[in-house]
Amino acid sequence: MPLLDSFTVDHTRMIAPAVRVAKRMKTPCGDDITVFDLRFCKPNEERMPSKGIHTLEHLFAGFMREHLNSKKVEIIDISPMGCRTGFYMSLLGTPKPKRVAKAWAASMKDVLNVKSQKDIPELNVYQCGSYKMHSLKEAKEIAQNVLDRGIGIMNNKKLKLSKKLLKGL
């Protein structure tokens, strides 16, 4: 099985909250696609609660589009990581990590301004596969934590695992 890009970086050296360019590629038509690692929690030390990350998923996708989409950037998808330490964001375009961090911070402020559970988009049996598994309180705690700690930028060169180490794992 091929080794995925996300498993060639040293998770013990990741900072959080932080933005990392996980992958850049060109489509056959010449469009640029960038995948960002938006790391909310330090791997193997912290993780977001299930209800909070699910609510954040519903809110974050819309708020990030409001703050980041432009003539040169269009978000394709924002999805939570299975390890519950962050989200992957795939988009058309090549925005700088600092611009992504600024949009992320603005989105977290937007989360804090959501008044009630009723204001969570697509929170119903028809549009959500686990519509009862939500917590606005937990989503707000996650957002506040990001804002309190500040959003850094990760350097892939500093995180890269050596070929020797990878062979031994």
Curated annotation (Swiss-Prot):
Signal peptide range in chain numbering: none
One matching Pfam family: LuxS
Reactions that this protein is recorded to catalyse: S-(5-deoxy-D-ribos-5-yl)-L-homocysteine = (S)-4,5-dihydroxypentane-2,3-dione + L-homocysteine
Cofactors: Fe cation
Cofactor notes: Binds 1 Fe cation per subunit.
InterPro entries named among the record's database cross-references: LuxS_sf (IPR037005), Metalloenz_LuxS/M16 (IPR011249), S-ribosylhomocysteinase (IPR003815)
Keyword Mitochondrion included in the entry's annotation: no
Keyword set includes tRNA processing: no
Record-level GO BP terms: quorum sensing
Annotated residues for binding of Fe cation: 54, 58, 128
GO terms for MF: iron ion binding; S-ribosylhomocysteine lyase activity
Role, per record: Involved in the synthesis of autoinducer 2 (AI-2) which is secreted by bacteria and is used to communicate both the cell density and the metabolic potential of the environment. The regulation of gene expression in response to changes in cell density is called quorum sensing. Catalyzes the transformation of S-ribosylhomocysteine (RHC) to homocysteine (HC) and 4,5-dihydroxy-2,3-pentadione (DPD).
Assembly and oligomerization: Homodimer.
NCBIfam families noted in UniProt: PRK02260.1-2
Record-stated family: Belongs to the LuxS family.
PANTHER family in UniProt: S-RIBOSYLHOMOCYSTEINE LYASE
Protein name: S-ribosylhomocysteine lyase
Gene this chain is encoded by: luxS
